[in-house]
Every structure is written in C-alpha cells, then in structure tokens.
Amino acid sequence: MLSSILKKIQPSLLVNFRIITRTYATKEVTVRDAINSALDEELARDEKVFIMGEEVAQYNGAYKITKGLFDKYGGDRIIDTPITEAGFAGIGVGAAMAGTRPIIEFMTFNFAMQAIDHIINSSAKTHYMSGGKVFNPIVWRGPNGPPTAVGAQHSQCFAAWYGSVPGLKVVAPWSAADHRGLLKSAIRDDNPVVYLESELLYNYKFDLSDQEQDKEYLVPIGKAKVEREGKDVTIVGFSRIVSNCMEAAEILAKEGISAEVINLRTIRPIDAETIVNSLKKTNKLVTVEEGWAQSGIGAEISALMMEHAFDYLDAPIERICGADVPMPYASNLENAAMVQTQNIVNAAKRVTQRNK
C-alpha cells in the first residue's frame, strides 16, 4: 500500500525505493543456556571479567552452566578452586578491589555460608567504608532455594538474608530473558550483586525475542515486571515460584478471578512502585516465596504496602511461604513443606472472599 501511495505522489521516488521489513524471530532457550550465553558474551566483551569457583573449568560447572567457557577462554579466566569457599571468596573481593570483575560461583548458596563474612563484611561494605573511593564489582552467583531430595542443609532460600544487607544488590530471575538481562547488568555493575538462581529452573524453556537475544540486552536491577495483568488480586513472587503464580492465575481465571502476577526480579532494592500501582487496580495482595515467613520478603513487602498503599487495600495481605521447619528429606514431607500452586489459589480466594 505504501508503494502505491508513493507512486501517485512521485513516481521518480520509486527508482531506488524498497520497503524493508524485519522479522522478529523468537528462540526457545533453557535457563541454563541463557545464563551460559550471558557469561560467554560478557567474557568476550570485557577482558577484566573472569569466573572462579569449584568445578567451573574442566568439569564445565556442577550444573554445566559454564559449559565450553574453559575451552574458549582458558584457565586464566575460568578458574577451578579447591573446596574452600572462604578462600576463593576472599580472593574475589581483592581482585574486584584491584579493578577486575570476578564472577564467583557457589555450587549452592548453602555453601556460601562459609564465605558470608567476605560477602557482607568485605564486599558489601567496601564502597561505603572507603567514602565512595573504592568499588567492588563482583557477582556472587549460584543456585538458591529448595531443589528436591537434598535435605535440610542444602535447601534454604537466602533471598531475605542477603536482601537485608546495605551495599548489596540482590536479584532472583525467573525467565530466560530475566537470567540473561539481569546477569549482564550484574556483571557491569560497579558494586556487588548477589545473583540467586534456582536449580529447578535450569531445564525450564522460555522463548527469547529478537531483542532479548541481543548482546546488549539488559534488564535493569530494581525493576519488577508485570507478567500477567489482572483486576481482582495482585500476586507477587520471584525466581522459580513465579511459575506457580502463573499457574495459579490460570486456575483462578477459570473460576472468574482475574489475577495480576508480578515477577519481582530484584529483591534489593524492591520495586515497591510497581506493586503499589497494581494495588490501585486490584486492592488485594498475595505474596509468595519459598523461604520462611519470619523476616521474609513477603513481610518486607507487607510493611512497604502498609507505608505506601494502605488506603488501596480492601483486605489483609496474605503471605504464602515455605513451612517454618528445616526442609525434610522424605518426599511426602518435602512436598508438604514447599509452596504448592494450590496454596496460592486458596490465598487469592480468601482475599477476594471467593472461598465460600
């Protein structure tokens, strides 16, 4: 149609005129491959970036996140360490102070407890204690939260632990695009970022748009995303639990309840504005997390909404959390301790008074 209009206006314009169209191809990618591609692209982009951790090099990582990177970049940039989290965490902090950009991989964040002194006392506080003169551009990454059948000592969610610390940014991505964009933003940040993954998400597949596949695609730290719009209730979650929130929204829709789902993406700083704007529409809120209720992310969001959105609330806020026990090993007890989709559905029905 554009060609015919131009023909009428000025035939001579058509001599070298072509209508250029661009197709936006989506690509299905696992979360594992999304993280791997982000690491690869940032290693190629900046020679100051390197990866250090247990089995990250020749073994390609315990979960194969670093597959192929040792062969491509060599042992000077993909560095295997002994099983001494406190040791290589301290080396990472010092290297970051010296101007490099370390990515420290923990086989699980449960093992990062051995290194928590360096993460909090060295890494998080350096910029403040130096009066803004010394930066600490380091990424602390690895699986967080409960996987399956690994017992109490390997199943904790550390979002609230690190989310309470000034000087840290804390992210917990869900989709493949989240993982790519937030990891790139974390690596390029001039101060420490705790990057919480989920072992149970590694094999999940998501579509990546043309834009999300771009090497310069970034997800801003501190910005939540509305994954599904709704008008009756707001459901807020992060990391793997967003999948359960989306499933719950589908079930609720069949029962006439329109749920808005917010993917928090960043734990610190929390994007309170996006939640407040959602509450202006729905007037009801359910928070969901895999961690414990006391002093958790849901508790913090509830406090923020009391301060910034009290007048918009038509019902008490519901918090759905993991059971207040160390994670059991027996599968039936483990299922009882973990958040299930039906827990979210029931909470949404309670706040909308549709549970009768």
From Swiss-Prot:
UniProt KW keywords: Metal-binding, Mitochondrion, Oxidoreductase, Potassium, Pyruvate, Thiamine pyrophosphate, Transit peptide
Molecular functions (GO terms): metal ion binding; pyruvate dehydrogenase (acetyl-transferring) activity
Task: Quote the Pfam families the UniProt record gives.
Answer: Transket_pyr (PF02779), Transketolase_C (PF02780)
Q: Look up the EC number in the record and give it.
A: 1.2.4.1
Compartments in which it is found: Mitochondrion matrix
Q: Give the reactions, separated by semicolons, that this protein catalyses.
A: N(6)-[(R)-lipoyl]-L-lysyl-[protein] + pyruvate + H(+) = N(6)-[(R)-S(8)-acetyldihydrolipoyl]-L-lysyl-[protein] + CO2
Query: Domain of life here?
Result: Eukaryota
What's one GO BP annotation on this UniProt entry? pyruvate decarboxylation to acetyl-CoA
Matching SUPFAM superfamilies:
Thiamin diphosphate-binding fold (THDP-binding), TK C-terminal domain-like
| InterPro entries recorded | PDHB_mito-type, THDP-binding, Transketo_C/PFOR_II, Transketolase-like_Pyr-bd, Transketolase_C
Which cofactor(s) does the record list? thiamine diphosphate
Transit peptide: which range? 1-25
Q: Which residues bind thiamine diphosphate?
A: E85
Question: Can you tell me which residues bind K(+)?
Answer: I138, A186, I187, D189, N191
Q: Name one GO cellular component term.
A: pyruvate dehydrogenase complex
- Its biological purpose: The pyruvate dehydrogenase complex catalyzes the overall conversion of pyruvate to acetyl-CoA and CO(2). It contains multiple copies of three enzymatic components: pyruvate dehydrogenase (E1), dihydrolipoamide acetyltransferase (E2) and lipoamide dehydrogenase (E3).
Q: How does it assemble?
A: Tetramer of 2 alpha and 2 beta subunits.
Q: What is this protein called?
A: Pyruvate dehydrogenase E1 component subunit beta, mitochondrial
Q: Which gene encodes it?
A: pdhB
